[in-house]
A protein has these predicted regions:
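Conserved phosphate/ATP/ADP-binding segment of small-molecule kinases
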Residues: 84-153, 188
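Conserved N-terminal subdomain of the carbohydrate kinase-like
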Residues: 1-76, 81, 220
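Structural signal for hydrophobic packing residues in well-ordered secondary-structure cores
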Residues: 34-37, 60, 64, 98, ...
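Charged C-terminal helix
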Residues: 188-222
Length: 222
């Protein structure tokens, strides 16, 4: 089940415009779904505006299942995908109740003020998140991720693949983790399996246009 928070005008070459959904519409859709079906996990990505964010935060206050947050802040060209004034509420109202937060290095720095992934993860735990996964796919070198939870911190190593820019890797990773948690898997297993799933999709990425390549997502059996 999905609740759209915005429409984007985009292609493989980037995002041209973001059209936020009406907060009342987002709230009504989410409230309608929650009144009918209890999701086994919830994943939040781009929220676009402070009003949409606050409406979602209010409606999820009573939700006690896994909550995965992909804190999408900016497009690759630097344009805002979550308005700047909403960033404090993202930390205080959304991240504070998260099972897992999955920022990339740039997002982690924007929200915490530090470029060090381990320190950024500790800061986001201080916001209230139960666990934090700082993803390294947008950094130079190998895409190593840092996971911090009640079990401690550990690095999850990755290998850079020579496919060039690939669209949607962070969204796919957070969604795959949420799907694993919905099945009842423990956090570390869910993260490791989701990471392998996305790495395979990156290895099979294909060019549909003249910009970033697209993930080729395939069914999994494990």
């Amino acid at each position: 089940m999905a609740v759209p928070t915005a429409l984007t005008v985009q292609s493989t070459k980037g995002i041209r415009r973001v059209l936020p959904a009406f907060p009342t519409t987002v709230g009504e859709q989410l409230e309608t779904l929650l009144g009918d079906i209890r999701p086994d996990a919830v994943k939040l990505g781009m929220l676009a505006t402070d009003d949409v964010l606050l409406r979602i935060a209010h409606l999820l206050e009573g939700y006690d299942g896994p909550l995965v947050i992909d804190p999408v802040l900016r497009a690759s060209d630097g344009s805002f995908l979550l308005e700047r004034r909403a960033w404090p509420n993202l930390s205080e109202r959304i991240i504070a109740g998260a099972t897992l937060v999955t920022p990339n290095l740039a997002e982690a720095e924007a929200l915490t003020g530090t470029r060090d992934p381990e320190e950024a993860a500790r800061c986001m735990r201080d916001f209230g998140a139960k666990a934090v996964l700082i993803t390294g796919g947008h950094a130079s070198g190998d895409p190593d991720d840092f996971l911090l939870s009640d079990a401690g911190g550990q690095w999850l190593r990755g290998t850079r693949q020579a496919t060039g820019p690939v669209h949607g890797t962070g969204c796919a990773l957070s969604s795959a983790i949420a799907a694993r948690l919905a099945r009842g898997e423990d956090l570390l297993a869910a993260v490791e399996r989701a990471k392998r799933f996305v790495e395979r999709a990156i290895a099979r990425a294909y060019a549909a246009g003249s910009g970033a390549r697209l993930l080729r997502l395939e069914p999994v059996s494990d």
